[in-house]
Amino acid sequence: MSATPSETTTERNFFVHPQALVESTEIGRNTRVWAFAHVMRGARVGADCNIGDHAFIESGAILGNNVTVKNGVAIWDRVTIEDNVFLGPNCVLTNDLNPRAYIKKSGSTLVPTLIRENATIGANVTIVCGVTIGQYAFIGAGAVVIRSVPDFALIVGNPGRQIGWMCVCAEKLPLPAGAARDSSVTCPHCRRSFVVAPGGLSVVEEVLIGKGENQ
């Protein structure tokens, strides 16, 4: 995966609602931008993304492929969203830890945030800048994330705290948040197997989606 869009469009091969504003020339194939959304020049959006009503994507923001941006989400400069990420309605991303209206910041003075591939960010979540959200992590609605999140972790509350782990299939795993390293678990829904590793869970046995068979 790369958060760099797969295509730079020289002709329109994506959809823009008549009441949306798209100034960027880097929008991937089959992406859809809906009413009152604004994508600024210098933003990079991959293929097959869905940008909901009233979303805002600032110059310098990067979205990978197949990203879902629900209504009212704002994505700022120095925020990178990898492939297959879901951003729920009105979730909030930031890029300045100590803002003042009279202090203007840009570029390297802003704080980067990375949301890794396949993560889910619930409605009304706030993500304080400077963190990494791990792959397949699941941030519950209304949570406030103030530190980096491991792969597959389930986070809820204010401040956000880990209460468990989520499977690739988006079901909660029967494994406590504080499970020791090398602890293992199998998802009762899809039969994928995982082990606790540095940085979160690691898949040790994959399945064929929809068939429940080992590869």
Set out the residue ranges of the language-model regions.
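Short linker/helix segments within small regulatory modules
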Residues: 176-184
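Short, non-ligating residues that shape and space the ligands of small metal-coordination modules
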Residues: 175-176, 195-197
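Short, intrinsically disordered terminal segments enriched in charged and Pro/Gly residues
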Residues: 149, 201-215
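Flexible, glycine/small-residue-enriched loop-and-beta-strand segment within the central core
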Residues: 3-18, 23-27, 32-132, 153, ...
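Conserved G/P- and acidic residue-centered "switch" motifs that form tight phosphate/ATP-binding loops
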Residues: 139, 157
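Short cysteine-rich clusters marking metal-coordination/redox-active sites
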Residues: 167, 187-190
